[in-house]
């Protein structure tokens, strides 16, 4: 995302490069110079390829910076120069490899006196190494011209960066022929002999360590190369030189002078251990011996190496008895005087490697020297040195696992001579391995019983005992080992058997850790017995969720008692259900007929016809007009639909209205009634109730709703359009009151004649009926279209009453019913107007949300 949107800041290097007098240091002061160089900025690369710039870069990494500079920025430019030269830009590599002047300036760094600056040496080694890998022919040709190159490498071998450069020269050259030429050239320069001469007590420790590591890496690299190139016609010259008997004798003679130097001895033993390596173990703890019949040099040890070591075995044995002088070591366990030391530890490692070769002559020499006895003494003496214990355990395991040796084989023999395993006999009979193990175990138990600390070698001792038991039972020398145990004195034999069956068995049992539990994995359905029954009754519907309803339709007997009582509740209503059902079906049929226009031949549902509005429709029309002067088309359509539904209802079907709602109902007739098809005034102010014929434009545009501006009141809820009778509570109501305080029910029945001729005769009159549960009072409502005023006139008549205690709603079906009342004249009485306004306001407030 960072690069996608180009949010990185632009580099200042391009701006600097546009200047003619820009210098290299100014560019190196920029923070992003390395990124620009690795991105191969064309201008920057061209600038760096200048001769003076490359010379400055090489100078920075080969010359010491001034001493008076701040330490924080002293090596800033050498570091940047090294990074720029090793950024792996092909143009820079080509220029450095082809320009001999730059190579000479770079090579001049080796001419400095030792010790070299370690940091500058690392810069020099890094630059020359990348040139060797990228331009091998040019660099090798240049180095061969220098007669003192190998001498300078040996001179500065104490610097680790120079040692790395030598190894790079051996490993970074990919062409096989060129690599072979380099090996031959270095062998001719006697680099192996010079490195061996460095492993001398007269040299310092750094030179010992680096020379030894260089020789070890040369051995490993040469053997790896032999594995990769099986058909190589020429052997590795450096490895062959190092395995020469004269070179090995020279190496051993250097370390066994009168003056014993621990660093030189350890370095020489490291080289011998590398020569004794056959093939690296496939995994830790695995001894990879040479397979039978395989004579590859990687799987065998050179005889010259074994012969040279065998001659110096007494000297190595003496090192175990008299190591180089070391100081007293204080540890948390106590004072070690003398400590084991690195020399004796490496000598035991060398003996373990010799035992792995299973050479008869070497085994005879070790028996004569009693080297294993000395090693066992050290094992029990230094009870807290785990490095020593590990090597002793390896030595004993190798002796027990190796087959019987044969005098005519100097390397690993595949013969198993049970009666000729001299080293195994020596271990049991001369070294008294069994007796020493039993004695040490008893001492440890006694010490622990007294509250003392357990010996540190007890873990390794347990493994040694298990190895002996395994060798007696299933080992390659089981016959000989079993016979050697039987040849023990009777007392020792009994103690051994008791120890194996009691102490050893208990220790192994205690040390054994079960990685996997014995309990088998089973289905979770078997665990149902582990779950207790809940203390509460569970819903049977949840228990039967997801099952087949036909199969599991029966409810459980443990259902909740409170839910069982639901069936006892009586939901019957005291209502005229037959009339309600008939009214509901009639309404549904009417709605289906109105909107079923798919090929029907019935009359158009939009055709004007005699309609009458229910109380709810009139209320919504009145209340909507009082709140605002605007109306939406959707509300107009809803009003028309309500009219269609009301026109189909029989005048004997009555709706029961709550008296509480009727008590708060009032009507307001001062606002013009803008309901469609009823008393709608034309937008130009003409009298729609007059007998004059309307204009043609109004006839064609009678259904245009764009000019209606009164929206419905937003405070109203969704109204119910169902014509079914509703049973409500019946409270005592004053039958003569027409305002809100009297709690009356008002039903407004309006009849609008849609025909043009009938409008002129009957348009000025509306009838509103005020009634309650016991009687009705009919008010004749007269509307003057010119003055837009409405006046009520009371007219008593005998009205039918409902048999129920609730109020009934009378619907005037057609215009004839409305014409039974004589028309009333408009009145200008202020008192009647106030009554009308109060009725309208109360009606709107009472019937707001339905």
From Swiss-Prot:
Which residue ranges have biased composition labelled Low complexity?
826-839
Map out region (Disordered) in residue numbers. 610-652, 683-778, 793-850
GO terms for biological process, alphabetical: regulation of signal transduction
Amino acid composition bias (Polar residues), ranges on this chain: 703-731, 764-778
Compositionally biased intervals (Acidic residues): 627-638
InterPro entries per the UniProt record, alphabetical: ARM-type_fold (IPR016024), SAPS (IPR007587)
Entry-linked SUPFAM superfamilies = ARM repeat (SSF48371)
Matching entries from Pfam families are given as: SAPS (PF04499)
One GO CC term of this entry?
cytosol
Can you provide one Gene Ontology molecular function annotated for this UniProt record?
A: protein phosphatase binding
Q: What does this protein do?
A: Regulatory subunit of protein phosphatase 6 (PP6). May function as a scaffolding PP6 subunit.
Family of this protein:
Belongs to the SAPS family.
Q: What is the official name of this protein in its record? A: Serine/threonine-protein phosphatase 6 regulatory subunit 3-B
Q: Which organism is it from?
A: Xenopus laevis (African clawed frog)
Q: What is the lineage of its organism?
A: Eukaryota, Metazoa, Chordata, Craniata, Vertebrata
């Amino acid at each position: 995302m960072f690069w996608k949107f180009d949010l990185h800041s632009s580099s200042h290097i391009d701006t600097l490069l546009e200047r003619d007098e820009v210098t290299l240091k100014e560019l190196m002061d920029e923070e992003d110079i390395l990124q620009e160089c690795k991105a191969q900025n064309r201008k920057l690369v061209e600038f760096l390829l200048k001769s003076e710039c490359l010379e400055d870069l090489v100078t920075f990494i080969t010359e010491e910076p001034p001493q008076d500079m701040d330490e924080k920025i002293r090596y800033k430019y050498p570091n940047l120069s090294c990074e720029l030269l090793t950024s792996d830009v092909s143009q820079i590599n080509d220029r450095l490899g082809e320009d001999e002047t730059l190579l000479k300036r770079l090579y001049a760094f080796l001419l400095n006196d030792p010790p070299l600056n370690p940091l500058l040496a690392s810069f020099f080694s890094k630059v020359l190494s990348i040139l060797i890998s990228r331009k091998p022919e040019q660099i090798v040709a240049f180095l061969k011209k220098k007669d003192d190159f190998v001498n300078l490498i040996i001179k500065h071998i104490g610097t680790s960066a120079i040692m790395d450069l030598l190894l790079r020269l051996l490993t970074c050259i990919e062409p096989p022929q060129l690599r072979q030429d380099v090996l031959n050239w270095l062998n001719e320069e006697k680099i192996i002999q010079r490195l061996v001469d460095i492993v001398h007590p007269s040299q310092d420790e750094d030179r010992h360590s680096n020379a030894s590591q260089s020789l070890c890496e040369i051995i490993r690299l040469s053997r790896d190369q032999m594995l990769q190139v099986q058909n190589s016609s020429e052997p590795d010259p450096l490895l062959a030189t190092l395995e020469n008997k004269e070179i090995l004798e020279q190496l051993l003679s250097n370390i066994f002078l009168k003056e014993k130097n621990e660093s030189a001895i350890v370095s020489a033993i490291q080289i011998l251990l590398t020569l004794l390596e056959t093939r690296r173990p496939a995994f830790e703890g695995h001894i990879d011996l040479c397979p039978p019949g395989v004579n590859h040099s990687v799987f065998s040890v050179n005889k010259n190496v074994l012969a040279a070591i065998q001659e110096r075995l007494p000297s190595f044995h003496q090192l175990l008895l008299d190591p180089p002088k070391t100081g007293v070591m204080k540890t948390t366990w106590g004072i070690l005087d003398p400590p084991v030391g690195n020399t004796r530890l490496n000598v035991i490692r060398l003996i373990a490697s010799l035992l792995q070769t299973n050479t008869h002559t070497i085994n005879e020499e070790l028996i004569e020297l009693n080297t294993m006895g000395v090693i066992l003494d050290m094992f029990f003496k230094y009870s807290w040195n785990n490095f020593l214990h590990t090597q002793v355990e390896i030595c004993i395991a190798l002796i027990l696992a190796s087959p019987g040796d044969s005098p005519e084989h100097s390397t690993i023999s595949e013969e198993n001579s049970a009666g000729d395993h001299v080293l195994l006999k020596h271990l049991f009979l001369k070294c008294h391995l069994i007796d020493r193990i039993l004695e040490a175990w008893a001492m440890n138990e006694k010490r622990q019983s007294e509250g003392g600390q357990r010996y540190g070698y007890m873990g390794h001792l347990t493994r040694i005992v298990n190895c002996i038991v395994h060798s007696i039972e299933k080992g390659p020398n089981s016959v000989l080992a079993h016979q050697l145990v039987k040849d023990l004195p009777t007392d020792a034999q009994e103690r051994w058997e008791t120890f194996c069956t009691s102490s050893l068995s208990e220790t192994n049992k205690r040390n054994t850790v079960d990685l996997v539990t014995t309990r088998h994995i089973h289905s979770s359905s078997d665990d149902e017995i582990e779950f207790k029954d809940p203390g509460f009754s569970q819903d049977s519907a949840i228990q039967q969720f997801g099952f087949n309803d036909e199969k599991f339709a029966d409810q459980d007997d443990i259902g909740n008692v409170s839910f069982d009582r639901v069936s006892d509740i009586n939901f019957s209503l005291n209502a005229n259900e037959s009339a309600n059902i008939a009214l509901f079906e009639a309404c549904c049929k009417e709605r289906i007929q109105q909107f079923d226009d798919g090929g029907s031949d019935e009359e158009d549902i939009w055709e004007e016809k005699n309609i009458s509005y229910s109380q709810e429709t009139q209320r919504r029309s009145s209340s909507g007009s009082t709140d605002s002067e605007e109306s939406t088309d959707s509300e107009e359509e809803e009003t028309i639909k309500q009219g269609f539904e009301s026109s189909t209802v029989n005048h004997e079907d009555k709706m029961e209205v709550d008296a509480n709602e009727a008590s708060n109902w009032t009507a307001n007739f001062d606002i013009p009634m803008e309901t469609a098809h009823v008393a709608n005034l034309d937008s130009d102010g003409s009298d729609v109730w007059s007998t004059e014929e309307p204009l043609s434009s109004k006839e064609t545009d009678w259904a245009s709703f764009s000019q209606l501006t009164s929206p419905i009141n937003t405070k109203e809820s969704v109204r119910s359009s169902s014509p079914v009778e509703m049973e409500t509570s019946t409270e005592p109501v004053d039958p003569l009151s027409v305002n809100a305080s009297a709690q009356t029910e008002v039903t407004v029945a309006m009849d609008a004649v849609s025909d043009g001729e009938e409008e002129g005769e009957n348009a000025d009159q509306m009838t509103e009926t005020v009634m309650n549960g016991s009687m009705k009072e009919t008010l004749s409502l007269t509307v003057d279209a010119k003055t837009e005023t409405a006046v009520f006139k009371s007219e008593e008549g005998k009205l039918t009453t409902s048999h129920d205690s609730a109020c009934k709603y009378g619907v005037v079906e057609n215009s004839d019913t409305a014409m039974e009342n004589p028309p009333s004249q408009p009145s200008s009485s202020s008192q009647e107007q106030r009554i009308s306004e109060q009725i309208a306001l109360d009606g709107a407030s009472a019937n707001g949300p339905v």
